[in-house]
Amino acid sequence: MASLSQLILEKKLDMKYSKKLKNQKIAKTRRQRGYHWEDTLVKRFNSLENWKAFRLGSPSVALPDVLVVNNILSVIFTIEAKSGTGTTLQVPYDQIERCLLWTNNFQVYKKREVILAFKFLSKKRIGSGIYENRKLHE
């Protein structure tokens, strides 16, 4: 039969790993939310005539989230996309700097802009002018 101290140790280990798994699940959900927002932006631009948008890769690479070009109008946008559940979202300075660097490197385009695209969790309408915060399921 297992000793009391061994049972306590096993319970602590179970709690530690279940908390770690829960945190991993939350992190995965947040990443998916961000990727979905980037994908939505790309689809919206690609649905417009003469516009081409591309997701540029993982966050570990020094690239903007989305690159958008219109060769007819000579326009390029670099987009840093942020999605969240709170009322504020922060964009790290280095991500803005990275977008500016990319935008300024394409001098053949007459109009070069950096766009910060934010998506916030919407509120649920429950009546005339009455809204309720949505419950976050992570």
Which role fits each region the language model picked out?
Residues 87-118, 126:
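Short, charged, amphipathic alpha-helix that recurs within catalytic cores of restriction-modification
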Residues 38, 80, 95:
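Acidic-residue sensor for enzyme active/binding pockets
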Residues 45, 66-68, 74-85:
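Conserved catalytic cores of phosphodiester-cleaving nucleases, focusing on short active-site segments
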Residues 2-9, 28-33, 113-138:
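Domain-level recognition of nuclease-like catalytic cores that cleave nucleotide substrates
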Residues 2-57:
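Acidic-basic catalytic patches of nuclease active cores, encompassing PD-(D/E)XK
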Residues 60-63:
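Short acidic/glycine-enriched loop/turn segments that link adjacent beta-strands
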